[in-house]
Amino acid sequence: MWTGLGPAVTLALVLVVAWATELKPTAPPIFTGRPFVVAWDVPTQDCGPRHKMPLDPKDMKAFDVQASPNEGFVNQNITIFYRDRLGMYPHFNSVGRSVHGGVPQNGSLWVHLEMLKGHVEHYIRTQEPAGLAVIDWEDWRPVWVRNWQDKDVYRRLSRQLVASHHPDWPPERIVKEAQYEFEFAARQFMLETLRFVKAFRPRHLWGFYLFPDCYNHDYVQNWETYTGRCPDVEVSRNDQLSWLWAESTALFPSVYLEETLASSTHGRNFVSFRVQEALRVADVHHANHALPVYVFTRPTYSRGLTGLSEMDLISTIGESAALGAAGVILWGDAGFTTSNETCRRLKDYLTRSLVPYVVNVSWAAQYCSWAQCHGHGRCVRRDPNAHTFLHLSASSFRLVPSHAPDEPRLRPEGELSWADRNHLQTHFRCQCYLGWGGEQCQWDRRRAAGGASGAWAGSHLTGLLAVAVLAFTWTS
């Protein structure tokens, strides 16, 4: 049937099949240009002057980005806007007092937007260079039903507001109206905030911390049967936030591990499905590209200063890299640097465990990008649930001391063997950066399009199919 096809048909069909099976392209990496970024966002600058225990500068060079979440640091590559640093975010404080109206429908969006410029300008003072900008609003959630436990105050006060305006309404009508008013106002606050800050600092990648969430914490109640999978209802609720994903330019899920999950398969599953859900959202809610995903994690377990085990470094940083995240952000608060002892423990952990692993996985992701994707994409695990990672092969590489002043303490020595390349090709595929295509990101679509901006193959697919059909008609 197909033997009589001419070269035009053959080429068109090859392009259609190849482009249709590719992953959507994503934004090229920022900062160092590495396919997988590891950022350090812990206020460890106090360890030297205050506690006489500075961290090793050579260790810190293992991180692509260094920042601090503390108030006094501005113009950083990573900026986190907590609720008191960006506009007038309506919420209830820790003692239940209303701040800026309490519930979003009681806040002033206009006044909030008026204040944004000054706040953004204070923390991000220049347009260049590009960076990550994370809005951390955790007091309420824009989906009504997700405001459970201590967040139920937002539903309760929303119902009271409606009841005060309509005392004759039945309870079910009050609830329905309260939900509508809350969700509409929450959406407006989040959307208009994103639109403003994106227009004001367009080179930064903007999104909300902990969005999307997976709500897969049921290991506490169901340890024996825990799978880590996101409940179907929560996946559906994430899809209700399509308006948020459409306006975001990056996603920032969180995979903080409780010590209950330490060195367990449950810990890996908890992380894996949260990252997979973020990558799903990043992919399905944009027609022509996938949003970059930067995963927040901690160098220690939640609510403590015990460093992650080797297994859990793999389950957090390694799993994120293998699944195709753009990077991880290692976050910590002032509790990491309260004394000489806490700084010493952190310094020892960095030298002994964290830095060697970060160097390993960062370079493994880079070598895979070079070998598999021509340096124009990142490697993504073919089977998301497979137990395979982007690690340097012990038979081909070793980490050796680096004496160059501008390099990390350790660097890889060796090269990929044919067995390494076969392993990568078997277990990983490429996700190309915008403007590149092909199974190995070998096609420069910008050049093929005559200088037009690089868009995903999906935008060309209809045209290619038309070419194929037309050419087949000519040869029939």
UniProtKB/Swiss-Prot annotation:
Principal location listed in the UniProt entry: membrane
UniProt superkingdom: Eukaryota
Residues the record marks as active site: E138
Positions glycosylated per UniProt: N77, N106, N340, N360
Catalyses which reaction(s): Random hydrolysis of (1->4)-linkages between N-acetyl-beta-D-glucosamine and D-glucuronate residues in hyaluronate
Signal peptide location: 1-20
Oligomer status and interactors: Interacts with MST1R.
UniProt name for this protein: Hyaluronidase-2
Organism: Ovis aries (Sheep)
Lineage of source species: Eukaryota, Metazoa, Chordata, Craniata, Vertebrata
Gene behind the chain: HYAL2
